[in-house]
Amino acid sequence: MPKHSHQFVEDYDGLVAFGLGREEDENTLTYYLQKFSDDEHMALIRGRMSEEDLETLFNLLGRLMKQYLTGDEYHKVFLKDEG
């Protein structure tokens, strides 16, 4: 069984828009991030991104996880550590 899932983007049929309210913003962000991280999309875009953009995106994601996840959450939810 796969450890990772992107089911939200498959099931979501709500509004995809930003700035209309917290719930719509959260749903839109989840939708966009799951679409962005799709294997086919990533294979296409990562080769076109500058070294600076790769580093900027990597650092942004790391900073957000460090800010909003505990160490245990990072290991359990993001890394999917079993132990």
Regions found by a protein language model. Name each.
Residues D11, T28-Y32, L44, L60, ...:
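Charge-rich, solvent-exposed alpha-helical interaction surfaces
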Residues M42-F58:
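Acidic, low-complexity, intrinsically disordered interaction modules
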Residues D39-M42, H75:
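A general structural signal for well-ordered secondary-structure junctions
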Residues L54-G83:
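Short, compact, well-ordered microdomains
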Residues P2-E40:
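N-terminal acidic leader/helix
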